Amino acid sequence: RLHTDTDEWIAPTVVSDLPEGTSVFTVFQKVLADKGYTYEYHEQYCYVQAITAPDGTRLAEFSKGQNSGWLFRVNNDFADVGMNDFVLMDGDEIEVLYTADYEKEPGMSLPYTDVSWDHWAYTAIKRMYTRGLMVGVNETTFAPSQEMSRAMLAVILYARSGQPAVEAANPFTDVPADSWYTDAVIWAAENGIVSGFGDGTFRPNDALTRAQAAVMLCAFAAFTQDDVTARADLSAYSDAGQIPSWAMDAMQWANARQLIIARDSAHLAPTAATTRAEMASILSAYIRK
C-alpha cells in the first residue's frame, strides 16, 4: 500500500512468487513500476527521497515541512533499516506512507527516557511497545535492565492471545484472586504454557530465568500450533551443562530459532535472570519468525 498524508495512491496490492531473501525495496520497485510511478532514492542513506505519481504529482522530503517525508513500515512496525536491508517473509504487509511530521507518527519514538535510540534492544522494545505487549514500569521509564518476573511473561503471552475469558480454577496457592496477573497465570496453566512447583506454588514474583523463558515460549508456540521441532546443538557453550533437563528441549528449540542466543561467545546463561530488554528482544524475534 502507498499513500500520502491525505490520499491513497496505490491500494493494497498482493505480490506473489517472490524468491527467498526478497527485500522491501525489490517489491517497492516492482509495484511502483507496474503502477506507473517513479521514485528518487538516496543510495548512501538508503531512503526514498521522492515519489512522483502518473499524473505528475511529486512528493519529496521537506515538501510539507522540515519533518515531512516518506516512511515505510512492515506489519505496522517502522523499520530501523533501509528498504534494501529489510528481508521479507511470507505474509508480510508493506506500507509506504508520506508524513507531514514523522515525530507525530505513532511508533516512531518511545516515551521512555531510559531507552535511547542506540540501546541494543531499542527496536525490539519499540516493537513490543507499539504492539501493546510490553509497557514501561511508569510513563517515562521502561527499566530495560530490570529482571522479568514469571508473572510478567505470562501476562505478555496472555495479551498476545487476545486475553480470552478464563473459566478454569486457580491451581496455585500463591496466586491471589484479584492480582494484575491472576487471569494470565490461570490461563497459561490451563493451556500447558506454565507449570508450578511441587509445593503447589507458581512463585509469580520470582525472577524468570532464561531457561524458564525458553520453556514458556516453546510451550506457547506449541499451543499456537507453531513448529517446535527445531533443535540446535548446544554442546559448544561452556555452560550447556547448567541447562536443567526439563528445559533442554526448549533451550535447543529457542537457540535454533535464534530467540535465546549467547550472552557472550561462550555462555547461554540458562540460570540467569532474563532482563526486560532481553525479553523484548526474544519476543520480537519470535514474532518476526
Residue ranges and their predicted role:
Residues R1-P111:
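Ubiquitin-like/PB1-type beta-grasp interaction modules and other compact soluble beta-rich domains
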Residues D249, N255-R257:
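GST-like fold's C-terminal all-alpha helical module
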Residues V24-V31, L153-A154, A213-A214, M279:
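Amphipathic, non-transmembrane alpha-helical segments in extracytoplasmic/periplasmic proteins
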Residues E20-F28, M148-S149, T209, T275-R276:
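Short, structural beta-strand-to-alpha-helix junction motif
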Residues D34-Y37, D92, R131, G192-I193, ...:
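Loop/turn elements at helix/coil->beta-strand transitions in domains of secreted/extracellular proteins
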Residues T6, F78-N84, L88, L97, ...:
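Feature responds to low-complexity, polar/acidic, surface-exposed segments characteristic
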